[in-house]
């Protein structure tokens, strides 16, 4: 199984991301996709449109962290957690 996906940036360049895991949230109706992008852990919220297509909205970036598990939100404010499973469990 190939755990890498391509993420299109705002400038249309492509970034390779390594998928660490995915968790579905019944509460929010999203699948949360956790990736490593370069030296950051990134969590995206995506919605399943059909079996072959997921809709990804760049505004749904939920968590950014560096690999030292220092979590930040998209406004670069540090969040009150320090390990990825806790973040996933929350959703």
PLM features: what roles do these ranges have?
Residues 3, 17, 27-29, 43, ...:
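Intrinsically disordered, low-complexity N-terminal regions enriched in serine/proline/glycine
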Residues 1-32:
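Short, charged/polar N-terminal "headpieces" of proteins
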Residues 7, 43, 48-51, 85, ...:
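Intrinsic disorder/low-complexity segments, especially N-terminal tails and targeting/processing regions
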């Amino acid at each position: 199984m190939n755990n890498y996906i391509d993420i299109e940036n705002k400038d249309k360049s492509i970034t390779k991301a390594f998928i660490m895991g995915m968790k579905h949230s019944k509460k929010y109706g999203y699948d949360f996709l956790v990736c490593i992008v370069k030296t950051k852990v990134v969590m995206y919220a995506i919605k399943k449109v059909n079996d072959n297509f997921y809709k990804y909205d760049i505004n749904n970036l939920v968590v950014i962290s560096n690999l030292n598990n220092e979590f930040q939100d998209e406004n670069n404010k540090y969040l009150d957690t320090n390990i990825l499973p806790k973040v996933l469990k929350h959703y």
